[in-house]
Design a protein with these regions (language model features):
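Single conserved hydrophobic/aromatic residue that forms the stacking wall/gate
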Residues: 1-11
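Generic enzyme active-site microenvironment
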Residues: 14, 48, 80
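Switch II (G3) loop of P-loop NTPases
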Residues: 12-31
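Short, conserved glycine- and acidic-residue-centered signature motifs
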Residues: 3, 28, 56
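C-terminal-of-GTPase-core extension/linker across diverse P-loop GTPases
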Residues: 54-165
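Loop/turn-to-beta-strand initiation segments
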Residues: 12, 43-44, 75-78
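Inter-motif core of Ras-like GTPase G domains
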Residues: 29-53, 66-69
């Protein structure tokens, strides 16, 4: 498969945020703080969301609120909606006048909403089915490249310019 040039240097590691969706036991708080330190040091945050989870939007809010509490700087973020293969919705009958709920929103409508909200800094994938994995790699590559070029404008070691012709 194709890899990211220089990805070993740029994407140091990922932090698992599932632990703070619900209240943390006291003994985990200290180890969790070190995970949060990694967030403070990161140049780019990649938030992976399980889109098949019934309360995924609530989980996104908890993560975003926690991120803003621990780090006041605005960091670039890519939202990765995973498990599109397991996403389900309940279509409503045309004559059904009850208000729509989250269960009535299809994947295309969800994509449009989140692409708008995230200014296209999100992607919908299925890691299991390998759907959009190459697009995810390309998106990560572009974002890391933008950060690198901003930080090191005269150093194209990681991202050398090639003619596309």
């Amino acid at each position: 498969g194709s890899g990211l040039v220089g990805s070993e240097m740029c994407i140091r590691d990922r932090s698992d945020t599932v632990g703070f969706i619900r209240k943390l036991p006291t003994e985990l708080v200290e180890s969790f703080k070190s995970t949060l330190d990694e967030v403070r040091e990161a140049d780019l945050l990649v938030h992976v969301v399980d889109i098949s989870h019934p309360t995924f939007e609530e989980q996104i809010e908890v993560v975003n609120r926690t991120l803003s509490e621990i780090d006041k700087t605005e960091k670039p973020m890519i939202m990765v909606f995973n498990k599109i293969d397991a996403f389900t919705f309940v279509p409503k009958d045309e004559d059904d006048l009850t208000p729509r709920t989250r269960e009535n929103i299809d994947l295309d409508e969800l994509k449009r909403t989140w692409m708008n909200k995230m200014q296209d800094n999100c992607i919908f994938i299925s890691a299991k089915e390998r759907t959009n994995i190459d697009a995810l790699k390309a998106l990560l590559y572009e974002r890391v490249k933008q950060i690198h070029i901003t930080r090191f404008p005269y150093n194209d070691f990681l991202f050398q310019q090639y003619d596309e012709e």
